[in-house]
Amino acid sequence: MPARVCHITSVHPANDVRILYKECHSLAQHYDTYLLAPNVNDSLSEGVHIVGVPLSTHRLQRQLQLGRVLRKALEVDADIYHLHDPELMSVGLRIRRQGKRVIFDSHEDVPMQLLTKEYLPRWSRKPLSSLYAQWERHCLSRYDALITVTPSILERLRRINPNSVMVTNYPRFQALPHSYGRGGQQYVCFAGEVAERYMHHVVLESLRLTTANYLLAGRVFVDAYFQQLQRSDLWQRVEYLGVLPPHEVGSLYQRADVGLVLLDYSPNVGYHKGTLGVLKMFEYMMAGLPVVATDFELWKEVVEGHQCGICVNPHDPQAVAAAVNHILSHPDIAQQMGNNGRKAVETLYNWATQEPVLLGLYEQVLGNLLSTPDNSPYSTLN
């Protein structure tokens, strides 16, 4: 019998790309795999048993309901539990006391993130960040292993728990068709969070200096910010498509000429260092789109190193427009950038390079409890 593993999220949707389509689907090829997720019907996805837990969408109310998560998790009776949300760290301790193995997957640098949370009074941010860091250390030092998505967070987590690895958020590679020189209206695009940190207001200002229109898709995070965008005289040049299911995002990319990912500098991404946890840039590259991206150190290594786009200051609409105009006015260069990006994802920045790290960590934590451990292709990664 294969070991049983259980991923738990109280915040992310059951169809989260990283959690379900990458980690859980990969694990289901080797383990009896469960995913506990909020407010969904029980179902099966490529061998993954999805189990719904009724939870409030209100942050404070949800804290009072975490007992439901714990009870459901213990009903699954897994050998290993993999947690995805900071609010679940106390649940992880309770599970650990039952003799189970626990992994925590840190998607964000929460202590740094708290320093910029707009909903928190400014005076409270540093004390709350410090308190969270202490609680995080208390919990995570007792877990069996930690996972994160980018080097800066990995460095911090290894000081808490040496058994920490990086499993980056690269896409599962699939060749998406794209062509240039189609004629007609040209577009820049973004599919993801409609949130201020992705600098959509700067994109709108850049449209004054280019003929491109903006294809925009994604969930609105703050209504006031979305309304601010809609009040702009440039909103008429935006085609907002709402939230697209994953299988329709590729069609958006096929319509576009340039992919934009202008993530703001912030403590959560190490300011100018940047993060590898943002999937969007690699999706554009996989789709054969030239990218215009924030000039983070990590992103410049990718974009400039593979000559697949241009990096700019995300606060400078003139720089954004200049980059877009350069790409749109040189279709041969755009085609080469797109080809370079796709090749880079096919060979380096894809989930197939990360899956062995995840599976190797599981095998190590579980103590080689695979049903056929002697034949495991991942034993050399322990």
Question: Predicted regions span which residues?
Answer:
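Short hydrophobic beta-strand element within catalytic cores of glycosyltransferases
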Residues: 259-261, 283-286, 290-293
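A short, well-ordered alpha-helix in the C-terminal region of glycosyltransferases
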Residues: 326, 333-348
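Glycosyltransferase donor-sugar binding loop
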Residues: 40-41, 213-227
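Conserved donor-binding/catalytic core segment of Leloir-type glycosyltransferases
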Residues: 6-8, 147, 177-215
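Donor nucleotide-sugar binding/catalytic pocket of nucleotide-sugar-dependent glycosyltransferases
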Residues: 51, 133-177
